[in-house]
């Protein structure tokens, strides 16, 4: 090969390599621009309800013939739709209940700054569960805790923490309230907060951290609500509220709320005579509540809520093993589904039950006279057969030598079914324990299980002699 041919050959090879490098640089540039603007190809919903985007850093190391290019690209995930909860999955089949959470608030109060509370409950958003309670505006080791046995003061506020986190000084005070209910519709939290004078209280409706609506007392006699979670189906939340006598006829209404705004109010209808402190759960396409009759019945009222047409039906749990306290001994107690049993109906305690086909799962105090001990069991035919008393799968949650209190239900949506859980309020202090001047509580929480389980007792556990007075 002569010199001229060598020069031409080297030049051709160099030109080819240069062309390849140029084309690769163009390809890199096109890829970079495409990935950078990919985020704009995602469709956003009309109402702009999206989850915040999370940046992802992509490192691309591209080796070329004689140099290294480090290209860093930041790309956003396409927005995810946030949808209302519809609770359309079936109820989980369970064999009983397994331990889930215990906050030990009273024991911790012996050496730390923990709020004085009562009326606790649990509710979950789509990703996490929270515990709520009505605080007394003071910690336990504080002279303001004296005489906190009283239910309604202007200092009471609704507290909210992750489940299992005691109400410490950093706890969020959601609203002013001496009666409350909370629920998450899939997009945001709704809090119903009642406060004010007994004869002219106000219920505030707080949605997504903002006051949206309110309603005043309609019977001028202690407007009050559930003290456990409300339920939202397809954006409509229902809450049961009562105003009027605690020992005679009262005026109960069911409020329908959408993003914090009251859209409809239905009066109680059906055969229930007195309804307070309902424990509600989704029973698609509606909502079902098991409540407290503080006037005539130790059997619990049932309220069925139709979310679509706002209609209401009510009756009583059929089980002859009744759920309220005080109550007659099981041998003598009765319930015939439609009416109050007129057995030690005056007074009572918040509680829960839920249907399982024709059967009923329920919880109650072990004592039939006082708020002592706690048990759960299933009654065969207890939802459909009058005065049914065949009990199976009994579990002791708190032994009869220890105090209990209010209890209520909350629901958790799993991958294939909706599980039912419950909490028990473990009251300590006044009136029974007169060494101290305060009244407060801790909680224990159980959830339904399809597995096996053992036995135990999960009382509050604080030694009252070690507690601040």
Swiss-Prot record:
Virion surface topology ranges: 31-469
Keywords carried by this UniProt record: Calcium, Disulfide bond, Glycoprotein, Glycosidase, Host cell membrane, Host membrane, Hydrolase, Membrane, Metal-binding, Signal-anchor, Transmembrane, Transmembrane helix, Virion
Highest taxon in the source lineage: Viruses
Post-translational modification: N-glycosylated.
Residues in compartment: Intravirion: 1-9
E.C. numbers: 3.2.1.18
Glycan attachment points: 61, 70, 86, 146, 200, 234, 402
Miscellaneous information on this protein: The influenza A genome consist of 8 RNA segments. Genetic variation of hemagglutinin and/or neuraminidase genes results in the emergence of new influenza strains. The mechanism of variation can be the result of point mutations or the result of genetic reassortment between segments of two different strains.
Assembly: Homotetramer.
Domain remark from Swiss-Prot or TrEMBL: Intact N-terminus is essential for virion morphogenesis. Possesses two apical sorting signals, one in the ectodomain, which is likely to be a glycan, and the other in the transmembrane domain. The transmembrane domain also plays a role in lipid raft association.
Protein's name in the database: Neuraminidase
Native organism: Influenza A virus (strain A/Memphis/2/1978 H3N2)
